[in-house]
Amino acid sequence: MESNTQVGNILDVGSLYAHLQSLSDKRKRRGRRYSLGMILVLVVLAKLCGENHMSGIAEWVKHRSEMMVEMLQLKRKQMPHHSTYRRILAEVVKIEELEQMSNEFLSGKKFFGKQVLVAIDGKVLRGTLDAGQNGTYLLAAYLPSEGIVLMEVAIEGKGSEIPAAPKVLKSLDLRDKVVMGDALHTQRQISIQIVMAGGEYIWIAKGNQPQMEEDIRLWFEPDVQPIPGLGFPPKDFETAQETNKGHGRIETRTLTVSSQLKDFLDWPFLEQVFQLRRRSISNRTGEIREQVVYGFTSLLRKEITPLQLLRKIRSYWGIENGLHYRRDVTLREDYTRMTQVKLGHAVACLNNLVLGLLLSKHKYRTIPAARRYFSAHPADAFQLVSRL
């Protein structure tokens, strides 16, 4: 059987296409009609150009078969059926290898600077709910400001995030990175792991660390009784504030930091504690909502200003407008029915790669705008996956 493989070297070594071609294929060569790298790059191309579902991807490729043959330098014009994409993603792709390749590829993109924030967070793939009672649950390490996933693993559920998080972070280069997660991840051992790997952490103190939360809260309470012989000792508080308008409300965030508890609180590498007040006013009703949270960080006062710390925390809380929104709404991840758990995980990983490619090109105002452009210019989409 004549296989639909490439007949010439048309790739830059560091391109996404080259990375996909490097993945191992467990199928025997006899009877293998389509290479794994070819299938994956066709999925990525179709997604760049606006397709989300496997049937739509297959039709998009079929209608552009002559273009695909020319660009990919294939031997034959016949393109895969949508069931072929599903079968290969569910049965042939090695998820761990695909995740590692994705990590290596995205880490090579120019997203990084000093003290870049890496967030850890879990997500249910609702499109896989038929595959299991709770659907596929993924734990990701990602860049909130970009919505880019660096590493993602499947876990049993939210309760499995704590043991899985160290494994995810171990696969990353944490030097010059600042790791943040929700209160579930405020754990001593992961704090040690992060700092020993050259990174820093920002944690929220809530119900799972009640004593830490109470100690920090009391520190920021106004002094009501003098200390015998000392009166009211001075505190080293520094404050930053930002006000933003949008989504029908005015929101003011006020962050106050202190370094004076670092020698009193029993937490590894703790340098500063903080209080964050959020006050929002509804433009329509005038309703006022206030929230106060407490946390701590391993970052020194000289390494980060209160305003910079405030913005990092806000960046983390922007996940719904970053990673989750882009994948759920723009790439329709939660609306794409996938009755096999492994298929859902593979598609999520490819979505991460698509977002990484699109976000590495800053000339597009939004992800939908970029996809509309590539829909009209598929040859440019091919350049994106085949060139550095």
PLM regions: where:
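Short acidic (Asp/Glu) and glycine-rich catalytic loops that position anionic groups and cofactors
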Residues: Q21, M196, I288-V293, I304-P306, ...
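Generic secondary-structure signature for well-ordered alpha-helical cores
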Residues: K170, G199, E221, Q225, ...
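Basic, amphipathic alpha-helical segments enriched in Lys/Arg and hydrophobic/aromatic residues
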Residues: L36, R311-L388
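An anionic, glycine-rich sequence signature occurring as long contiguous blocks
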Residues: K206-R314
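Dynamic "connector" segments at or just before major functional cores
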Residues: M1-A119, T128, A140-E152, P166, ...
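Polybasic low-complexity intrinsically disordered regions
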Residues: S107-M180, T186-G199
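Short, conserved catalytic/metal-binding motifs centered on acidic residues
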Residues: L42, I57, H81, Y85, ...
